[in-house]
Regions:
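Short, surface-exposed patches at the edges or C-terminal ends of soluble domains, predominantly
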Residues: 1-238
Length: 238
C-alpha cells in the first residue's frame, strides 16, 4: 500500500493524498517499485503540480490517519472490512475526505486486462458508499463519452463520468448532490466527505493540453484546480 502525506506550505492545513494500493498511478508511473525508486523517476504531472504547493511525504496505512485532517483517495484498491470501519470512524471523528471513484475508468495502462497491476476498472468502495446512503452508477445516455462540465468558472473535461444516487433513507450520513450528481457533499458525524463520481479527470490527457500550455502557460481545462479547491474547502454545501 502506497500513499503520500501533503502539508500545505502556504495556507497551513494538512492534506493527505493517498494512492493506497497504487491503482491510479498518480505518484509515479507504472514502471513498478524499482522504477519509482530510480534517480530519474518522474512523478505524474498531477502529483508534481500538487507538490508545488504541498510538502509530500509517504503514507502506507489507514491507521496512520489518526493525526491527519484531510485525505484524498483516487480509485483506490478494495479495502478490507476493518479498513472501511477505520476510515468511516476517522471521518466521523472530524476527518475530511475527498474520494474520486470511477464506475468505468478509462485511464491508460501499460498492463493488459486482468493484470493485478492495472488500475481498477470500477470503484470497489460500494460498501462504504452504501453505508453513507449513496450508490455510484454509470448513466446510460446517447451522448458522447467525452464530457465537458461547467463548474463555477471552471471547465472540467473527462470521460464516462458517473453519477451519485441516494439510496434508502440516507444511511448514516446527510448528503447533498451537486453538479448533476457528479459531486456528493456529505456530513458524517463531525467530519465531511466530498465524493466525485469520476477519477479519469486526474489523467493528463483530459486537462493538461500541451498546445494550450505552450501558448498560455496554463492548463486547457480546470480539472486540477477543481480537485484542489474541494480538497482544501472548509465550507460545506449542507
Amino acid at each position: 500500500a502506497v500513499g503520500f502525506v501533503v502539508e500545505d506550505m502556504l495556507r497551513g492545513p494538512r492534506l493527505v493524498l493517498a494512492d493506497i494500493g497504487r491503482d491510479v498511478e498518480i505518484f509515479f508511473g507504472e514502471g513498478g517499485v524499482e522504477a519509482d525508486l530510480a534517480d530519474d523517476a518522474q512523478p505524474h504531472p498531477a502529483f508534481a503540480r500538487l507538490s508545488q504547493s504541498y510538502d509530500v511525504q509517504p503514507l502506507d496505512d489507514v491507521r496512520d490517519l489518526a493525526k491527519r485532517r484531510i485525505l484524498l483517495l483516487a480509485q483506490p484498491r478494495a479495502f478490507s472490512p476493518t479498513e472501511l470501519v477505520q476510515l468511516d470512524s476517522w471521518v466521523r471523528n472530524g476527518g475530511r475526505i475527498l474520494i474520486l471513484a470511477d464506475p468505468a475508468l478509462q485511464w491508460g495502462s501499460l498492463y493488459p486486462l486482468g493484470d493485478k497491476r492495472r488500475p481498477l476498472f470500477t470503484s470497489m468502495l460500494s460498501p462504504l458508499f452504501a453505508h453513507w446512503g449513496l450508490e455510484l452508477v454509470l448513466p446510460i445516455a446517447d451522448a458522447e463519452p467525452m464530457a465537458i462540465r461547467k463548474i463555477g468558472q471552471l471547465s472540467i473535461r473527462t470521460q464516462t463520468p458517473g453519477e451519485w444516487l441516494k439510496i434508502g433513507r440516507g444511511g448514516s450520513a446527510r448528503c447533498a448532490l451537486e453538479e448533476g450528481g457528479l459531486l456528493a457533499d456529505c456530513k458524517i458525524g463531525k467530519g465531511r466527505a466530498l465524493l466525485i463520481a469520476d477519477a479519469d479527470l486526474l489523467d493528463t490527457v483530459y486537462w493538461e493540453g500541451r498546445g494550450m500550455r505552450v501558448l498560455t502557460g496554463g492548463d486547457e481545462f480546470g480539472n486540477l484546480a477543481w480537485v484542489e479547491s474541494l480538497a482544501t474547502s472548509s465550507s460545506p454545501i449542507i
